[in-house]
């Protein structure tokens, strides 16, 4: 994208928010509003993803007035009988402290309901 003058592309939130090399455009969401990606608009999009009991979900382009239309979750695969430290690492990643650092690292803090669902899944690990 950077090498071709006038190129349009899609980048992970972290590449845009932590770089002066790329310009961001506003995208029209289903509600008809033009929004740019930031922690607030991305979280608004994430908060509308409906997850089943296996934490699977789709269609992140919901009609929230302030929702950024292109959002996705980052998934972690952990086996029920995981190695020592996996459960503790995932607990930390989902902690309020770690979530508070997310935006500065180029990630969007999880909405509280998604964070709680993920924590419940972590607790099933042995």
Show which residues each predicted segment covers:
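Exported/periplasmic ABC-transporter solute-binding proteins
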Residues: 1-126
């Amino acid at each position: 994208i950077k090498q071709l003058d006038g190129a349009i592309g899609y980048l992970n939130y972290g590449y845009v928010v932590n770089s002066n090399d790329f310009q961001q455009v506003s995208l029209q969401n289903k509600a008809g509003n033009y929004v740019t990606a930031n922690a607030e608009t991305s979280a608004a999009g994430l908060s509308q993803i409906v997850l089943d009991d296996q934490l699977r979900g789709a269609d992140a382009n919901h009609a929230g007035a302030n929702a950024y239309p292109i959002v996705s979750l980052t998934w972690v695969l952990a086996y029920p009988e995981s190695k020592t430290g996996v459960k503790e690492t995932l607990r930390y990643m989902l902690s309020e402290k770690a979530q508070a650092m997310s935006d500065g690292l180029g990630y969007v803090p999880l909405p509280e309901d998604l964070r709680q669902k993920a924590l419940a899944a972590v607790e099933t690990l042995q």
